[in-house]
Amino acid sequence: MTAYTLETLIDREAIRDCLYLYCRGIDRLDEKALRAAYWPDATDSHGAYKGSAAGFIDMALVKLQQAGRMVHQISNVLIELHGNEAAVESYFTAYQEEKDTNGQAIETMLCGRY
């Protein structure tokens, strides 16, 4: 078992908060929460998108305006701290509602890793 210092526990909780902020931000299209989840110079490799986190947020906020309900959930968060850097892996489950070109509802369940 790893012995944690107060500082490492605080760091780990801050990382978890970023994951939760992302989920809340994307589900509610909350730009402030989304931007708070990333460093200003962060990059994102998110499905077909690969580029700056700011670019991903801008794209997602426009694309998802027409989406219905979204629910992102995080689990199995593994955080490895290495000095001033961290390696983080988490699993997600996401439910999304959209409409096809005929206006019919499409429900999608996604699972993966962040």
Task: Tell me the role of every PLM-derived stretch.
Residues 18-21, 75, 113-114:
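Short, hydrophobic/aromatic alpha-helical segments in well-folded domains
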Residues 1-28, 32-40:
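Short, low-complexity N-terminal intrinsically disordered segments enriched in polar/charged residues
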Residues 7-10, 102, 106:
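Conserved aromatic-histidine-acidic binding/catalytic patches
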Residues 105-114:
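Conserved helix-adjacent loop modules within structured domains
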Residues 14, 71, 110:
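Soluble or luminal CAZymes and related metallo-dependent hydrolases
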